[in-house]
Amino acid sequence: FVDESEKKLLLKCYKFNCRSCGSNELKRVVSLGYQPLANNLLNKKNEKCELYPLEVNYCIKCHNCQLSVAVDPKKMFTNYLYTSSTSKVFRNHFVDAAKKYLKEFKLNKKKSYIIDIGSNDGVALKPFLDLGFKKILGIEPAKNLAKLANKNKIKTFNGFLEKKNIKKIKKNADLILASNVFAH
């Protein structure tokens, strides 16, 4: 049972139709109950936090699988606690990827413009910086992570990649990265 405020919250973010085809023929196939948002740690033992159903629905019409609830991205990413650079495996992966992209796409260290969408703390852009690239830009909605990336000399715009922010990107990119955006 949920109280009235939880009911309003759920109705606001619950997806009754398939995001691919629009059908309302969705069947719940996995339910992990009510969960807090990832990485949202409480400060006090009795502090209340919002819980969301963590469920996967299957569309009978087009076979798409989707989460039943889409939490407002601003709520999820305003202050995001996970920093990608804490993973040595992740750091090494992006070093290897940068070297591969440099060679495969014949990128020019002085002229090529590289953008990373959902750049977190700049983990995917740092290897390009270390290789001598001058024109890089991270786009990161979490204010704390954008600030951290900028502090580490990785130019990062704090915001979502949406129409109103597109004009802030000064030119066409030669390489666009979006390593972790689909995980959310």
Predicted ranges, named:
Residues L54-L131:
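Fe-S ferredoxin-like electron-transfer domains
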